[in-house]
């Protein structure tokens, strides 16, 4: 998922309703990602990533041209310091996308779900370490419970849940750097995909020249799914940005749990992944931590309503 959109104050009930509709669309679409990437299980995950980058770059560049924003995007490439930040965020988002695709294709939907459940708490912890933000006792309690849940899983399974931790840390760090650099959400993703596009195109050229490309060899359905990678990536992002303009951040903070919850349900009931006692305890502890964190966030929002307004 992208960094949080800046919320603008809206008093209109109609705006709030449309904002909630956009938010539901965004998080439901993200929640359905396992179905999409699982349908591409016969395509190597790195090749799926390449298609996602190429078609997203084309779609985002077209969007920028339509909105008259090509100028600001091209101007970003002439700013060495900002390009340094972009280099970092590009590596992080590509790693995050690839790990998630790989996880879905290798029967680790539940691990992906866990990663996005703990992501908000990782964001809070990164804020403490790098932005020197201060936490109250309830927030520390939530983080401690989440850390305990991960340690419990490691102790019981004897294996580090690297998929979950990698997804949470890569996306959390991605959001942190974007916040520090004050990147515009859509403009930033456009620059990132344009930076990745040459590598993706080079990979595609290599696979085609060596007869390893999946496009055109695995059937029409697979071809259409690969071509849809750009729409699949950009559509929920656009919905999320529209929601961010109409809803308070506190509302978005609650609705965001739709995505990992849908992924959790898909992992258990659709893909029938193994869900034993150890995993059950881990998820329950994470849910308790998130309940504490969300309760505190809502309490803080009621005490300081302006915290959910635009920065």
Show where each model-derived region lies.
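Transmembrane alpha-helices of multi-pass small-molecule transport proteins
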Residues: 2, 44-95, 170, 191-208, ...
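Helix-helix packing/entry segments at the starts of transmembrane helices
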Residues: 114-118, 185-195, 234-269
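Loop-to-transmembrane-helix transition segments
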Residues: 18-25, 72-99, 162-166, 214-235, ...
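C-terminal-most transmembrane helix of multi-pass membrane proteins
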Residues: 2-3, 257-311
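Glycine-/small-residue-enriched transmembrane alpha-helix faces in small-molecule transporters
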Residues: 2-47, 148-180, 202, 305-311
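Hydrophobic transmembrane alpha-helices of multi-pass small-molecule transport proteins
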Residues: 5, 60, 138-154, 165-167, ...
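Structural motif at transmembrane-helix junctions in multi-pass transporters
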Residues: 42-47, 98-115, 238-255, 274
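C-terminal transmembrane-helix exit sites in multi-pass transporters
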Residues: 102, 119-139, 261-280
């Amino acid at each position: 998922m992208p960094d949080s959109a800046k919320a603008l104050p809206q008093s209109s009930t109609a705006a709030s309703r449309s904002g909630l509709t956009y938010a539901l669309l965004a998080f439901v679409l993200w929640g359905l990602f396992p179905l999409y990437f699982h349908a591409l299980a016969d395509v190597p995950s790195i090749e799926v990533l390449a298609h996602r980058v190429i078609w997203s770059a084309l779609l985002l560049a077209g969007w920028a041209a339509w909105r008259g924003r090509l100028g600001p995007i091209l101007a970003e490439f002439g700013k060495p310091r900002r390009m340094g930040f972009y280099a970092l965020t590009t590596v992080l988002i590509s790693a995050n996308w690839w790990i998630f695709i790989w996880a879905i294709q290798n029967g680790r939907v539940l691990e992906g779900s866990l990663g996005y459940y703990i992501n908000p708490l990782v964001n809070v912890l990164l804020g403490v370490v790098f932005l020197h933000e201060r936490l109250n006792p309830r927030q520390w309690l939530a983080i401690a419970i989440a850390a305990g849940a991960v340690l419990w899983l490691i102790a019981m399974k004897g294996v580090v849940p690297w998929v979950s931790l990698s997804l949470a840390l890569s996306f959390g760090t991605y959001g942190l750097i974007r916040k520090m650099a004050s990147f515009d959400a859509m403009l930033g993703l456009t620059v990132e995909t344009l930076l990745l596009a040459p590598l993706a195109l080079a990979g595609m050229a290599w696979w085609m020249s060596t007869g390893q490309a999946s496009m055109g060899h695995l059937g029409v359905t697979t071809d259409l799914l690969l071509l849809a990678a750009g729409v699949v990536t950009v559509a929920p992002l656009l919905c999320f940005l529209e929601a961010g303009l109409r809803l308070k951040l506190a509302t978005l903070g609650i609705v965001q749990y739709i995505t990992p919850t849908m992924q959790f349900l898909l992992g258990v009931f659709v893909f029938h992944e193994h869900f034993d006692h150890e995993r059950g305890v881990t998820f329950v502890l994470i849910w308790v931590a998130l309940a504490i964190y969300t309760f505190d966030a809502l309490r803080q929002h009621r005490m300081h309503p302006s915290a959910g307004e635009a920065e």
